[in-house]
Amino acid sequence: MDKINNITKISQVAPEVTWFLRNLGFSNYYIIKIYDLVGDAAIGLTEDNPYWLLEEFPRMGFDKADQVARKLGVSPESHLRLSAAVTYGLRAYAAEGHAFAPLEEFCEKAAGFLDADTSLIKDVIEDMSFSGDVQLTNLEGRQVLYFYGYYRAECTVAGKLAALAEPPGGLAPVAANIDAVIKKAGQSRGIELSPQQTAAVKNSLVSGVSIVTGGPGTGKTTIIDSIISIMEESGLKTAVAAPTGRAAKRIMETSGYPACTVHRLLEYFYDEETGYMIFGKNSENPLDYDTVIIDEASMLDLMLTEALCNAIKPGTRLILVGDADQLPSVGAGSVLADLIDSDYFFTARLTEIHRQSAESLIVTNAHRINRGESPVYGEDFVLVKADKQQDILDKIVDIASKLSMESIQVLTPVKKGTLGSANLNDRLQQAFNPAGEDKAQLEFGSRVFRVGDRVMQIRNDYRLEYRVQRSTPGQFDSRTDGDTGKGVFNGEIGVIKSVDTEMRTVTVLYDDQRWVEYSYVQLDEIEPAYAITVHKSQGSEFPTVIIPMTWFPPALATRSLLYTAVTRGKKQVIIVGNPGYLEKMTANNQSRSLNSGLKERLVGMYGFY
């Protein structure tokens, strides 16, 4: 359901709804959010199934929904409660990047959480599998539990990619003399492709599905440029996209070729009737391109990859470009790593650092870190020593405040604590954008949103409306001034341009010139972004990156996280803290194992399409 109005005050809520929800223990904040979403239907929906709230307001938590259910007389052993808990638990696994949960492990955790017998949990899971909500299956000799959508996505991606890799009708031919065309493509840009790059381009041209992976400075962008040039000369149509707007913008800046997000390539829209995001491009209305190139492919999650595969017609080249050593996608699945590990598709692994990039200590040290070696320091890769966390915090603020807000980004492994993103943002906001009589601001819980603040959208919201206003129409895609639409995505960064204290709204301008107005109850969807977690920085680059270095939990203080953080810097990386912990982080090659069956489906080829 779509929201019925821009409700911002408790006085705007129907009295009977306020009374009903307040008696169930809801604060004014949630009463307003619920009424804003479903209006008078709030009473009936909640009486029928109080756990509906978890789908719309996941941050509410299961305990709160459970309290409401108890007040409404829902039995602790009811199917309604247990099935809601299974759904909630699988969402928790997905939030950690897992496509499935091992059944026995899941049932034990759920039984402990609910204080229920595991047999009850298994009975409910069996019922849910019959209704098509979840999928029970065997994988590598054990029973595992999927949301049905993730199971379908794995099977679809495996089957579709296998079919694309060997299209029965063949690929649209490029110019006859491939070697000469590749050489000419390099010369047109004043460069000579290395043997590694030449092989990558050549194999991408003759393969239905190919992967190009490598660290910074290994020439991935040059390969993309060369492929685009060859396709244009051959009269073939090419689409270039990336999972995030910032990554798409970077392609535009480096190649001059039009690029967009994968969502926009697939023409996503919010369906008012179903309440789901729909892709206009699909198997019935496929993309009309001969070649599709996806950059920053390490950020592709399982569900977006399924939508992409559904929209690519047979005979289209699909080229995935990314850095497999970076952190995996925020969403469920480990798509790029699984595709590479399956050995099913041609994969070019770029290892040579090219001359111009070799002069950058950021590039040099990224590769050193990836090999488990200590970084070396200089003008563009700086170590500022400090031991105590408070000293590290003070030095970060001091360093950052001497630079422009637009040029720096603080990246940290954690959200909480002295050096977590929340506390860093409080201090950096004071440094960059202190309160003033000429700056409107709005308090929201413990946060203050002020005109001029840098903020980030922290969850996908397909209902959120935007309008486009840019000085150069069509700069990043086909949208023009005045266009409107819906959908703002997790990780998008913008700046607050206005605050209306009377209407309690905040207006944010995002990087691609979309303006979004947030009502008061929507402000939990954004947070300050002077400092962000490393996971949230994926797909972005910043002129100067500042990284605190102290003790962090071993599961987070990993080589891949440090590598990802360092590779976000374009001109300078500044590490502030204890070099001893940097050494430990570099040595910690522990990688988070994600539950994914995509590799096994490709190897066994028991997917369907």
Where in this protein do the model-derived segments appear?
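Conserved helicase motor core of P-loop NTPases
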Residues: A324-K486, K497, Y609
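Residue-level recognition of short, solvent-exposed, well-ordered loop/turn junctions
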Residues: K313, V448-D453, F489, S537
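Conserved helicase motor core of SF1/SF2 NTP-dependent helicases
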Residues: S226, I230, S234-L236, P243-T254, ...
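Accessory, non-ATPase domains that flank or precede helicase/AAA+ motor cores in DNA-metabolism machines
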Residues: M1-A176
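N-terminal pre-Walker A segment at the start of P-loop NTPase domains
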Residues: A176-P195
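Conserved RecA-like ASCE P-loop NTPase motor core of nucleic-acid helicases/translocases
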Residues: S210-M252, V321, F381-K388, D398-T418, ...
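N-terminal pre-P-loop "Q-motif" helix
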Residues: G190-V206
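C-terminal accessory regions
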Residues: G482-K486, N490-Y609
